[in-house]
């Protein structure tokens, strides 16, 4: 019987040696913006391409610039580490990686030797990596400030709307964000953006993340794997993988990890 990964990622390990990325493994890397001071950002800039550095220099808001440098340099270091055979990569190796955005904006490594996706909020960034299967990840701050009912009517499927009926208060808010992050993760894994209508498929509203139905015959629901990611009670996070997942690992990435 094929091993089945846990349905939730809740443990984060400090990196002591580079983890091997097995065929059906999923790795999720967590970055905390608070760990990036001015010295760390200066060092991180060495991993950016000339184009990325110029892009950062044109950003007017300091917080946006800092997050861009931290995210893009960490992404390059993480991907280069896998491709280097489990070792920290030098800046020139990380800079040499070709990252491109698809027709609907999904970033990818060219050629696609590993697959990845990322999401961020005001406090954290998560980078999901898989060896061969397309992956999508989404993280949202849980708040009641959004017009939840209007979003549900416009974007959720009839089955999802039915799952939310009768809920109110915190129960409704929690279920809404479970559905929303799971749907976003599926869309990001597909790489189609809103060209794939959000109401064209159903995800679960309860604690276990599942893709329940897809109204496109070419998509095999049974081939997908979904799981929750526990970042903090203030965030809802989900990962969708278009393929089998036999193991899940979470790692904390800091700017002080050096080759």
Tell me what each language-model feature is.
Residues 1-259:
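Core catalytic alpha/beta fold that binds nucleotide/phospho-ligands
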């Amino acid at each position: 019987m094929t091993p089945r990964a846990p349905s939730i990622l809740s443990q984060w390990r400090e990196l002591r040696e580079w983890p091997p990325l097995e065929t059906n493994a999923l790795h999720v890397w967590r970055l905390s913006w608070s760990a990036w001071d001015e010295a760390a950002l200066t060092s991180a800039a060495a991993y950016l391409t000339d184009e990325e550095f110029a892009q950062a220099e044109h950003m007017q808001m300091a917080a946006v610039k800092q997050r861009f440098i931290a995210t893009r340099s960490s992404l390059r270091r993480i991907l280069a580490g896998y491709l280097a055979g489990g070792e920290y990569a030098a800046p020139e190796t990380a800079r040499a990686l070709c990252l491109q955005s698809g027709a609907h904006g999904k970033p990818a490594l060219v050629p696609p030797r590993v697959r990845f996706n990322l999401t961020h909020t005001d406090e954290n960034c998560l980078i999901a990596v898989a060896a061969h299967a397309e992956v999508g990840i989404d993280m949202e701050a849980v708040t009641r400030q959004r017009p939840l009912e209007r979003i549900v009517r416009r974007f959720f499927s009839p089955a999802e709307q039915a799952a939310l009926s009768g809920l109110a208060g915190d129960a409704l808010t929690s279920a809404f964000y479970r559905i929303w992050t799971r749907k976003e993760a599926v869309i990001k894994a597909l790489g189609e953006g809103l060209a794939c209508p959000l109401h064209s498929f159903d995800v679960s509203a309860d604690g276990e993340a599942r893709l329940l139905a897809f109204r496109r015959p070419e998509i095999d629901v049974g081939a997908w794997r979904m799981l929750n990611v526990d970042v903090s009670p203030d965030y809802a996070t989900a990962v969708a993988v278009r393929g089998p997942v036999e193991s899940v690992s979470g790692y904390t990435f800091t700017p002080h990890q050096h080759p």
